[in-house]
């Protein structure tokens, strides 16, 4: 995740709510005309479908001056059925664990890329709201020379930062708009619609409901330069889905007082 410096700049720059887009109707059933979807119906204890997901097997360095990048505060992602697996009840489980000498979490990134004019949604339960955990549901672009990231839901176990929904327009975390959100341990759906007028977010979407947060395509001003950035309407620009439960780092904080194992459950991911 690229957006770690944003918190150091504060949460003062909130995007104003703009006109509500016409909501795109989801297919009537899970077998409908989704562009991409996974209901996680695999065998109990198995890895997620490798044709749809790549499981991370390494830790991701995070640059942040808060001090939590020290090794004792930095859990690794592990490609292990202890940390990333399907539970046999139609859920993907990302589990954070505490081993004698380290902490481990899980991250999966989608193999499918989607373009503008799409709606992305996941149903998630956070049994991981404890010190040290750092769960997130987000979209990214890893093309060379590109930038941009969409964080639908991110919670921080460091005890200092509010959970948030954020749009990043560059890779250094200096051009962003963010909205603090309330997060709990119940099941919730987190949806984003991305179109030419902007990016719109809903929690537990119902027909006719306005988005709780919107960022217009006019661009996001960089904190360090008098320029407005917006890669999301570029020709050929795509995003791919990521789900993760990290441990430690600047967002998770010190996990020593946390309760482990801790889990992030994902019922489904759907794009249409």
Residues of each region from the PLM?
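Residue-level detector of secondary-structure transition/capping positions
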Residues: 14-15, 207
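Viral virion structural and adsorption modules
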Residues: 7-8, 18, 38
């Amino acid at each position: 995740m690229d957006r770690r410096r944003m918190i150091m700049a504060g949460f003062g720059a909130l995007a104003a709510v703009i006109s509500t887009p016409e909501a795109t109707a989801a297919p009537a059933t899970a077998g409908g005309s989704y562009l991409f979807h996974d209901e996680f119906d695999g065998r109990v204890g198995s890895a997620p479908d490798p044709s749809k997901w790549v499981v991370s097997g390494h830790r991701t360095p995070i640059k942040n001056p808060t001090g939590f990048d020290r090794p004792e505060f930095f859990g690794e992602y592990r490609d292990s059925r202890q940390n990333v697996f399907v539970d046999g009840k139609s859920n993907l489980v990302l589990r954070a664990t505490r081993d004698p000498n380290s902490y481990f979490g899980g991250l999966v990134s989608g193999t499918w890329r989607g373009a503008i004019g799409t709606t992305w949604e996941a149903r998630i339960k956070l049994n991981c709201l404890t010190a040290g955990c750092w769960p997130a549901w987000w979209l990214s672009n890893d093309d060379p020379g590109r930038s941009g990231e969409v964080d639908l839901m991110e919670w921080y176990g460091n005890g200092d930062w509010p959970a948030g929904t954020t749009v990043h327009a560059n890779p250094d975390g200096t051009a962003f708009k963010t909205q603090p959100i309330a997060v709990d341990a119940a099941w919730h759906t987190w949806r984003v619609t991305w179109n030419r007028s902007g990016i719109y977010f809903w929690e537990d979407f119902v027909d006719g409901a306005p988005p709780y947060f919107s960022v217009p395509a006019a661009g996001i001003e960089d904190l360090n330069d008098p320029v407005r950035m917006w890669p999301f309407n570029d020709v050929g620009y795509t995003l791919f889905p990521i789900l993760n439960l990290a441990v430690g780092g600047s967002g998770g904080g010190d996990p020593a007082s946390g309760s482990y194992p801790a889990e992030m459950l994902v019922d489904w991911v759907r794009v249409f």
